[in-house]
Amino acid sequence: MIQDAFVKDMNEELLSWFMHQVVIRDTIIRRSTDADDHRSLNIRSTAVLSLLIQPPLTIDIADIEWLELCDDIAMLKDIKVFLVNGPHAASAYLGWYRGYTIINELLEDEDGAAFIQEVTKEIRAGILQQYPISEEQLDKLSVFPKAKGDMPDTVYRVGKDPLRKLSYDDRLCGSARMCKAHHLPYEYIVQAIAYGLLYDEKTDEAAMQMQILIQEKGIIVAVHQICGFSYQDDLLKEICSWYVRLKNK
């Protein structure tokens, strides 16, 4: 736990003060932030929805703008990864495949926007079956108001580290598994995963490791190792099939 990292080296007096004065709570961040690299002091960010904070707190934040107490943070974090981050990653990988550098460019492309809409639709259907959440609650969490000035969001930032973003429980593979478990369509999610496996940005170390694995072991072994699906799983077979089709297109 995060709290353990804080308190492990405290003496008795400091620990007593800490336990009475400090609370550590989970949050859900709903905003886009970009920078040239992880050391950059020039950070571009936009916020259109409040920071969701796990209760209880020791202070009243009712009058503080952009902060909002919210129950069921753990469940909502899982949902947010699937429903917000899933289509976002799909946008990056499809955008890369089509030669875009900015996510916004893909979403202005009629076909691209339609594809992401279908990915979102599949994930949303799975979530409504998997979790005790209403359509209204889902909209409140995931439908972002339009910002006054759109911040260009790079394909590089959103697609970075495909080894993590294509892993078993993460945004796309986790969504596909969820839909499959409830006997719901997942065709567009599977295609998005295949686009992700084609992501070969040269400056992305994880992307290069992924491409080396595919080249050396083949796509079937690579999907098994990266996405975590068994060799008998229909998801593995469908992802590999789409990968070959898209690669040869």
What are these regions (language model features)?
Residues 1-249:
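Substrate/ligand-engaging "lid" and interaction regions
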